[in-house]
Structure formats: C-alpha cells, structure tokens
A protein has these predicted regions:
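Carbohydrate-active catalytic/glycan-binding domains of CAZyme proteins
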Residues: 45-352
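Bacterial Sec-dependent N-terminal signal peptides
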Residues: 1-46
Length: 352
C-alpha cells in the first residue's frame, strides 16, 4: 500500500509535465487503485464484553432527563411482575439504584393497573406532572407522579381501551401540542400503529388510528416466522421530519436489530432507511440489539439506549447498553441520515 501511495504522489507532482493523454491515464490510476484495494464492506465490530457481572439488567430501557439528572427505567431482567425500578445518574455513566419510595420502585404493582408482565416503560413530562406509559398484562396503561422517582399511580386503575392486545407505548408530543401514541398491536404479527391522544392521556382518538410499520424486508424476519415482529417504537423530530425507530424479529432471535423510517407527518407514510438495520449484532458485537429510546446529553449530543442478549449463548437476563448517534447532513433536499457510532457502544453499570 505504501508503494501505491508513493506512485500516486509521484504522478501528482509530475502532472503538469505530462501530455493530455498521459494526464488522462494519471486520473484513472487512483480510481482503479481505490476500486481494487480501497473498498471493503464495513468491518464487523469487536465482540462485546459480556463477562463483566457488574451490569444493569433492564430490557426495553428508557432514559428520562430532568434538570441535572437522568432516570433509567426498563423491563426487569429478574422479576417483571412487580413493577419498575429506577436508576439515577448525573453523567449517563455511573448509575445508582434509587432508594426512594417503594424500595426503589418508581411504579409498583398494586398502585396501578396490572398484575404481571410489567414491560417497556416510557416516562415524560407534561406541564407540572410526570407520566409513565407502560405495559401490564399485554395492555397499555398510563400512570402519573409528582416526581420522576415515583411513585407513579392511577386514580382509576385501568388500561387504555383497545379491541386487541397492545404493547410498547411511546408518547410523542409534537411542536404544535398534539399528542400521539405510537404502540404495537398484536394482530397477525407485532405491528406498529399510531393514534392521536386526548389531552388527558386517558384514550386515543379512534378515528386517527393508522398502521405505521410491519415486517416487509428480509432483515426484519430472518426466521421467516409466521408471526413477524416489529416493535419498540421511538420517535424524534428533526428538521420538520419524523424519525421512527423500531426493532424487528423476535426478541430471542440473535438477529433482533433496529432500523428507522422517515415521514413528513406523524402518521406516515413511512419510508424505511435503505441502510437498515443501523443497530445490529454486526456493528455492536453482540446478539439481540434493540428496543430502546433516545436521550440527549447535556451538550445536546444524542444517544440511543437499548438492550442486548446476555451473551452469544443466552438471551436473559438482557443487558442495558448505550451508543452515540448523530445526523449526517443530506447532500440534497432529502432527509438527513441517522448514524450510530459503534465505537462508543458500552454497557451501563451500577455504581460500586
């Protein structure tokens, strides 16, 4: 390779001494060298370190920022039938399990709807209250609290009404104040839907319900399952476009991976990114990468928090990981591209 670089530099230095015919050949040589030697598909990531037992075991994680603190919630890797514990951090690196309230639980069974299967929480603030959208008994419910630490409770212990089972809520409040519930409905597969919500977050406006994402591409159903899965929606708005993150395949599948789609409206139609998946076992170095949420750092940097399998040979308990992300500016009038930075991948750890 050093010799090839030397040849190119020598040709460039003598460029203006050459004839027109020689100059034409000079331009072709670097291109040929690049085509022969310079192109290779992106290298696979190094294997993630799964030998460290000092880890946080939360699946379907979400991080909520309030003032100077970050709050981490997720589906428990040990007992998902009691509610949701919460970890806190000031720097997204060192995490401490909360001792406030119900033994560290931000939401606990008995205070809200649900007896089992407490999955996929999302916490957000609206006016002076904090809300947690979550799953229990394969239904979506929303609880409220005066603090991100909880306790999150319901005055009326009930789920959102729906004719089918539904999971994985993500509430997005648009810049015009309208509220949308992105969620998964279990109907001939796990499919992502959206509907506008009422201002009190107690119901959806049924007439606005739209299907957003189903498994239509090869990477989204690598097992050719009869019940294809797209789940774990998370939405952000960038330059007046909506970016919908989603994860495909059964969560037990090593190919569980994350991609995104873009739309000019909250309802779609959604155009899937041609480079999907952008978070996968290939670039993260571990199986089962997905179902996460976005969080912004204190310097406006963007992160994606998600879970992975425990190891290459075991699914559970799933580990909580995070990776940096950013937008690559479009060269034309199209959508900016979301890119992950695989070298920043690491697992979240509890404070010693």
């Amino acid at each position: 390779m050093k010799k090839l670089v030397y040849v190119i530099l020598t040709m460039q230095m003598n460029f203006y001494k050459m004839s027109i015919k020689q100059r034409g050949f000079c331009w072709r040589v670097p291109v040929l060298i690049f085509l022969i030697c310079g192109y290779a598909p992106p290298a696979a990531a190094q294997k993630a370190n799964t030998t460290d037992s000092n880890a946080i075991y939360l699946a379907d994680p979400t991080i909520f920022q309030y003032k100077k603190n970050y709050y981490l919630y997720g589906t428990s890797g040990h007992n998902a039938n009691e509610g949701f514990i919460v970890y806190t951090s000031t720097n997204l690196k060192s995490w401490e399990k909360s001792t406030a309230g119900n033994n560290g639980y931000a939401l606990r069974k008995g205070d809200v709807f649900g007896t089992a299967g407490f999955w996929a929480p999302q916490v957000f603030q609206y006016h002076n209250k904090f809300y947690m959208a979550y799953v229990a008994n394969e239904n979506i419910a929303i609880a409220e609290s005066s603090s991100p630490l909880g306790p999150f409770v319901q005055n009326v212990k009930a789920p959102l009404a729906a004719p089918v089972k539904q999971i994985d809520p993500f509430i997005f409040i648009d810049t015009d104040g309208k509220k949308y519930l992105y969620h998964v409905r279990l109907t001939n597969g796990n499919k992502i839907f959206v509907a506008e919500m009422t201002d009190d977050f107690l119901a959806i406006k049924e007439e606005t319900l739209r299907e957003c994402i189903t498994a239509t591409e090869g990477w989204e159903n690598t097992a050719n399952a009869e019940w294809p899965v797209t789940e774990g929606p998370a939405v952000l708005k960038h330059k007046n476009l909506y970016y919908l993150f989603y994860t495909a395949n059964d969560f037990r599948n090593p190919d569980y991976a994350t991609g995104y789609a873009v739309s000019s409206t909250p309802y779609g139609p959604w155009k899937k990114f041609s480079g999907n998946p952008i978070v996968s076992k290939r670039n993260m170095g571990i199986n089962g990468t997905g179902h996460g949420d976005f969080v912004q750092g204190k310097h406006k940097e963007l992160f994606y928090v998600f879970h992975t399998h425990y190891s290459d040979s075991a699914v559970a308990p799933r580990r909580t990981a995070i990776v940096n992300m950013g937008f690559l500016k479009s060269r034309n009038s199209g959508a900016d591209t979301l890119r992950v930075q695989p070298g920043t991948f690491h697992y979240l750890k509890p404070k010693n």
